[in-house]
């Protein structure tokens, strides 16, 4: 994977993303390779939020952490009734925490990823969340 950014950190971080990302996240690779780490991380997490909204049939006004808590919380369309209650809470908190930590801040202010590895790991976290959502989509279909 070729990056326009130089230095060992940028190259190593780009190599982390040299994997088959979820099809809805493939477009963030180009932003990352251009050194637009903040945009790549934000765009990846935004895709997670969009997918949760689609699967839960939530209104567009319900956003961020509130969307995650409603969608995966008790009685939420994406909550898995087969899971142990603690595991259901864990999934809800995983999604709420990821969105609250990595998607919300750049929505409201400038966030600087000085470490490209951190930004690549945000993209990989979004990839995992999208794969979990694929499994959820199959269950709620």
Predicted regions and their residues:
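Amphipathic alpha-helical interface elements
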Residues: 1-98, 112-117, 135-141
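Structured adenosyl-cofactor binding patch, chiefly the S-adenosyl-L-methionine
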Residues: 119-137
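Histidine-centered active-site/metal-ligand motif
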Residues: 107-108
């Amino acid at each position: 994977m070729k990056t326009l950014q130089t230095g060992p950190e940028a190259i190593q971080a780009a190599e982390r993303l040299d994997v088959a990302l979820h099809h809805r996240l493939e477009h963030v690779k180009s932003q990352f390779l251009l050194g637009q780490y903040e945009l790549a991380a934000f765009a990846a997490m935004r895709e997670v939020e969009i997918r949760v909204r689609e699967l839960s049939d939530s209104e567009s006004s319900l956003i961020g952490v509130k969307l995650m808590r409603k969608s995966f919380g008790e009685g939420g369309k994406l909550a898995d009734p087969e899971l142990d209650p603690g595991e259901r809470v864990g999934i809800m908190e995983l999604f709420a925490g990821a969105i609250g930590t990595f998607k919300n801040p750049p929505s409201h202010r400038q966030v600087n990823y000085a470490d490209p590895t951190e930004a690549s790991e945000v993209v990989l976290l979004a990839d995992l969340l999208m794969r979990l959502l694929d499994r959820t989509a199959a269950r709620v279909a």
